Amino acid sequence: MTSPIIISIKKNYLSKLEQQNIKIYKPFGIILFARNISNFNQVRQLTSSIKSLSKKTLIFIDQEGGIVNRFKNFSEFQFKNNFDFYDIYLKYPSLAKQLVYLKSFITNYYLSSLGIDVNTIPVLDIPNSKTVSMIKKRTFGSNLKINTILTDILVQSSFEFGVMPVMKHFPGHGLTNKDSHFTKPVTNASTKALNHQLSLFKTFVKLPMIMTAHIQYQNWDNHNIATYSPYILKDILRKKLKYKGLVMSDDLVMKANNQSIEKSIDLSNKSGLDIILDCSSDWKRYIKILENFKKTNFFNNKNKILFSKKTSNRRLQSININHYHDLYNELIKLYGI
């Protein structure tokens, strides 16, 4: 049985302490950042090492492409932001679909070959004129039809290669000009505007995993951010949208979460979270979190594992990935975009 936490590690290899604790506590997931990545062989060795210590621990990454890129120095991962594809779609719909397909195919090919199980995409926030740039650039735009078409291409590619998608940031990060990494966004948006933010989550409600937003939605819960809101996670997500998958938090070390560890775990338990994400890489902190899990019975009633990695139907070694890279680059050059 795994512990209901997704953790991070400090370097591009496991320290003795990390090896020991991963083996003992078996975290639900370990999320990789740029600091954990040097080259492809090193990543394969790292993911293999993690699996040897805890077979059921899933390897996560946030590899959206564009401004969120954990492979920044790798030529294989140089892609446009999602919002750029929305702009391209307005002029060349077929081209935009082809480019998103190629980007997704290439990304998932590498993630699968590196032993990565989960990618925290798609971003389903619906932007408007006030949306903070850090979020807007990561979306496929405000047109629901276009967004749905491009998101579906991205999601299907993930499943094709056995990489689980995680939709985010529920119930929507599009109504604020604040970045929850640095402060706690609070929105007074109307119920109508809030329901509009749910549109894409309804469309993709059958995806196996969802990440919450560290935002306070005054008209739904004027006390808690969505991550800690029973009304948002139980009444809206579970009852209204009938979501059956796994619910994980955004990173608890983000500035939008100003609660103590004890309070965070208590609120997470009451809100209906299944898994928490903590990217501190701090094992003293992780041990404290795990101790608080036991106090709140988080272990007993939250540890649902709803996903087991499917073996890809494709034989990775038979794919000429350079062909897909060349086609992507040729199309970009041909259309001058």
Regions found by a protein language model. Give the residues of each.
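N-terminal small/glycine-rich loop or linker at the start of catalytic domains
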Residues: 1-4, 64-89, 126-134, 165-187, ...
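N-terminal hydrophobic targeting/anchoring segments and the immediately downstream early-domain regions
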Residues: 1-78, 332, 337
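Second-shell residues forming the walls of enzyme active-site clefts
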Residues: 7, 35-51, 152-159, 163-292, ...
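Short, acidic/polar
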Residues: 9-24, 99-110, 194-200, 260-267
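Glycine-rich tight-turn/loop motif centered on a GG-T
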Residues: 35, 77-97, 131-150, 178-195, ...
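Glycine-rich, aromatic-flanked loop segments that form ligand/cofactor-binding clefts
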Residues: 54-80, 100-126, 147, 151, ...
